[in-house]
């Protein structure tokens, strides 16, 4: 849609500006006026980008780029069910992208055709979930969720995000890795009779959950317990797992819901509803749905995910920074960056356009990070004085979740936490001169700060959707398909062949793999 990324007139202007971006170390640069002007408050968040290397001219050009690339129109098309997961002229999944429809039913929205159908089915599944939870929460004390990728990362991140603000007497575990030690660790911790096992696989054939399900089924058989009374499936209709004779209950999702965008479907619904109750899950959906609507705001400087996306494009494509660090100053978000790695890098780590052509510019940065203040004492040395400049996205909250705090030396721990967040952003931006070169901080290291009052279920849902839409906007801008993941398939295909060699049933010759296996089998 619109002009190609490299054909945009705004990009030419931005390239000129990138030669001499604003100097954040200049005296008076971070004035009160700039701080107030370069901020946006919406949907329970305040977003500060005064410490990014942008000025009004740059922001106007970025707005122009959003218009030339028709980003809002593309977002509208996505939410209404257009075929956004496609590569023109080549075999591809050719599907709509409708994770937003899984939460659209909690607010009034005029949806078309398949989007309306997915919203309707999502409501039906949610109502079935409410009935199921009424019985399951009374009967079971523990839940184990089995899944890989988006079937684990998003739900796990959101479970821990909500854990501090939602009282719960339930124990939750996640099993994802095909490494049997992962399953063994969890089996040691649980009472099988009190445990509900949720197996998540859209296709019903995913290797990792299939292997782990078999390990758990064997454990239940060895205990003489009924498997069908303890196991729940979340899968597509008609998949091999869509079998009520093998499961206590089967919940459904659809082809148009990508794994990394599935936390607001039953992929996240069963575990979050079991852990915190159905109402907490609905609050979570409401937060996500609010950002879905907000993401359609036309003006970039009034649209949280669009603004963040375009600042990311500026940092990646114009200033040339290869990585982005996401640093939440919240223990509840300790698994959130891992989810963002998948959501961002699996979506936009592409080198082919939607027209099937090789592209000649940078796409997704490497996304990484950890929880503050912990990481201030590990990799922040490199952020401040290393040879690579790393844009940082700080996330913070004014109040902690659990209510426990103390005052030491005149300030609470929550105040100290937030003070450190702000201090790091300013230190990166302004730096500090010193005659001792070892103590010199050059500054001009960009960052942004996203703050909410407290990490609640609603804010967790909004934060999830904020980043989903940020990455979608960036993919739209670059003209790539953010909704497939062909890069996952080659390694899986080769692994299947190597498993055949190891089991003595190799379907094809694979001398390189045999050579590798001979090298390492010497250790046995």
Swiss-Prot record:
One of its GO terms (molecular function) is glucose-6-phosphate isomerase activity. GO terms for cellular component: cytosol. The active site is at 346 (proton donor), 377, 492. Keywords: Cytoplasm, Gluconeogenesis, Glycolysis, Isomerase. Pathway: Carbohydrate biosynthesis; gluconeogenesis; Carbohydrate degradation; glycolysis; D-glyceraldehyde 3-phosphate and glycerone phosphate from D-glucose: step 2/4. It is found in: Cytoplasm. It comes from the Bacteria. It is an enzyme of class 5 (isomerase). Catalyzes the reversible isomerization of glucose-6-phosphate to fructose-6-phosphate. Belongs to the GPI family. This is Glucose-6-phosphate isomerase. The lineage of its organism: Bacteria, Pseudomonadati, Chlamydiota, Chlamydiia, Chlamydiales. The gene is pgi.
């Amino acid at each position: 849609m619109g002009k190609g990324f490299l054909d945009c007139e705004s990009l030419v202007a931005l390239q000129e500006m990138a030669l001499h971006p604003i100097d954040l170390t200049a005296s008076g640069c971070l004035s009160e006026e700039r701080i107030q002007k370069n901020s946006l408050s919406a949907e329970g968040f305040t977003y500060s980008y005064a410490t990014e290397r942008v000025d009004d001219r740059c922001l106007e050009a970025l707005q122009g780029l959003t218009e030339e690339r028709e980003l809002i129109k593309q977002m509208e098309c996505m939410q209404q069910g257009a075929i956004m997961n496609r590569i023109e002229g080549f075999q591809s999944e050719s599907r709509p992208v409708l994770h937003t429809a899984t939460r659209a039913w909690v607010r009034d929205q005029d949806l078309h055709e398949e989007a309306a159908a997915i919203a309707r089915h999502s409501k039906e599944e949610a109502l079935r979930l409410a009935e199921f939870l009424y019985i399951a929460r009374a009967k079971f004390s523990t839940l184990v969720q089995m899944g890989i990728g988006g079937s684990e990362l998003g739900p796990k991140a959101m479970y821990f995000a909500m854990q501090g603000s939602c009282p719960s007497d339930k124990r939750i575990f996640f099993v994802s890795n095909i490494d049997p030690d992962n399953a063994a660790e969890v089996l040691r911790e649980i009472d099988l009779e009190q445990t509900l096992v949720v197996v998540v696989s859209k296709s019903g054939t995913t290797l990792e959950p299939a292997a782990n399900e078999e390990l758990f089924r064997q454990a239940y058989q060895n205990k003489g317990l009924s498997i069908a009374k303890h196991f729940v499936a979340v899968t597509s209709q008609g998949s091999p797992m869509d079998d009520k004779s093998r499961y206590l209950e089967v919940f459904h999702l659809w082809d148009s819901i990508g794994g990394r965008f599935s936390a607001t479907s039953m992929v996240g619904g069963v575990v979050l509803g079991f852990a915190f109750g159905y109402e907490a899950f609905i609050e979570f959906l409401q937060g996500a749905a609010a950002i879905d609507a907000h993401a359609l705001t036309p003006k970039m400087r009034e649209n949280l995910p669009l603004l963040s996306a375009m600042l990311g494009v500026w940092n990646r494509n114009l200033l040339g920074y290869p990585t982005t660090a996401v640093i939440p100053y919240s223990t509840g978000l300790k698994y959130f960056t891992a989810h963002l790695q998948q959501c961002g890098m699996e979506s936009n780590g592409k080198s082919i356009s939607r027209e099937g052509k090789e592209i000649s510019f940078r796409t997704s940065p490497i996304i990484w990070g950890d929880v503050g203040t912990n990481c201030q004492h590990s990799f922040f040395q490199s952020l401040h004085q290393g040879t690579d400049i790393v844009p940082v996205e700080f996330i913070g909250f004014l109040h902690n979740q659990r209510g426990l705090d103390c005052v030491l030396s005149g300030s609470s721990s929550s105040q100290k936490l937030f003070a450190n967040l702000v201090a790091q952003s300013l230190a990166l931006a302004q730096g500090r001169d010193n005659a001792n070169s070892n103590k010199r901080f050059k500054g001009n290291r960009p960052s942004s700060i996203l703050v909410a009052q407290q990490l609640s279920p609603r804010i967790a849902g909004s934060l999830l959707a904020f980043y989903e839409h940020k990455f979608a906007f960036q993919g739209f801008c670059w003209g790539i398909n953010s909704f497939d993941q062909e890069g996952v398939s080659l390694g899986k295909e080769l692994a299947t062949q190597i498993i055949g060699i190891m089991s003595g049933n190799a379907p094809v010759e694979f001398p390189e793999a045999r050579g590798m296996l001979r090298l390492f089998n010497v250790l046995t």
